Design a protein with these regions (language model features):
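Intrinsically disordered or highly flexible coil/loop and linker segments, enriched in small
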Residues: 192-193, 229, 260
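Short, amphipathic alpha-helical interaction segments positioned at domain boundaries
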Residues: 241-262
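Minor-groove-contacting beta-hairpin "wing" of winged helix-turn-helix DNA-binding domains
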Residues: 235-240
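C-terminal scaffold of the Radical SAM
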Residues: 1-210
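An alpha-helix initiation/capping motif
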Residues: 86, 177, 214, 241-244
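A short, conserved structural fragment
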Residues: 224-234
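Short amphipathic alpha-helical interaction segments
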Residues: 206-224
Length: 262
């Protein structure tokens, strides 16, 4: 399988270098069980030799009901500790930075002029279309997922041909995201989010507007002091690499604030 992946990367590099494709991306998963620090570094450096214009680096997410989750519960599989995972992620950032890649979102790196437009649309809270089995679209703010099972997806497509189109294809009334989700999405981007700008959508009276802003600042004060979070005017963004690697701490405090004011 690894050999097939390398052949695919080599083909994509050749097509890109010849100008037949404009860009391509490679997805990698770090902090895997049974994968040590050196093994991951070797894989990452190997990937860089193919010069992919765009790289997405994800951490393994263990879901309930999966084989991995069962093995972990049985003590037969062990994930890296939080300290090991942080060290790995920090090393990943430095290797990619020294190889000419810039980080424009927590999980995404690219060479100049190769930011993913789809990723930027998603993290900016704008709408997008996706097509095919199991795909998720959000053209007007609300997410719609197509059936994941082939049989059910075929039935869904047939209904579109024989009856009226599904409302997810025709409803053009935009559904705005909740404020906490909008802040969370914005903070994932390198440029962060203008808090007072996204506050405006709440139509709060001035006194409530300023009160809620002050309460959020209180929650974030310790992260501003520690350097995980940076403020420039009303714009807040996560520092690199520590803020982005430890973003959950900042986001959890923001969700706590949101629950308290609602």
């Amino acid at each position: 399988m690894k050999e097939d992946a390398e052949k695919s990367c080599l083909w994509l590099k050749r097509e890109y270098d010849s100008g037949l494709i404009k860009s391509w991306s490679l997805d990698l998963i770090q902090n895997l069980p049974l994968s040590g620090f050196k093994e991951w570094q070797d894989d990452l450096k190997k990937a860089i030799t193919f010069s992919p214009p765009h790289l997405s680096i994800y951490d393994l997410n263990i879901e309930n009901g999966t084989v991995f989750k069962k093995l972990i519960n049985l003590g037969k599989l062990k994930l890296p500790s939080d300290e090991e995972a942080f060290s790995n992620s920090e090393s990943t950032h430095l290797i990619l930075k020294n190889s000419g890649y810039s980080r424009y979102e927590i999980s995404n790196y690219c060479l100049p002029r190769h930011q993913s437009r789809h990723n930027r649309v998603y993290w900016s809270g704008l709408g997008w279309w996706s097509f095919g089995q199991g795909s998720t679209s959000s053209p007007w703010g609300e997410k719609f997922t197509r059936p994941r099972v082939s049989k059910e997806y075929k039935k869904w497509v047939t209904r579109q041909d024989e009856f009226n189109l599904d409302s997810s294809l025709t409803n053009k009334e935009f559904v705005y995201k909740e404020l906490d989700e909008k802040i969370m999405l914005g903070l994932r981007l390198k440029e962060g989010v203008d808090i007072k700008e996204v506050f405006k959508e709440q139509n709060w009276e001035n006194k409530k507007f300023e009160s809620n802003f002050s309460k959020l600042l209180e929650e974030w004060e310790r992260f501003l002091r520690s350097g995980l979070l940076v403020r420039k005017g009303n714009r807040f963004f996560l520092s690199e690499p520590n803020g982005m690697e430890l973003s959950n701490q900042v986001l959890v405090s923001m969700f706590k604030w949101w629950d308290e004011i609602n």
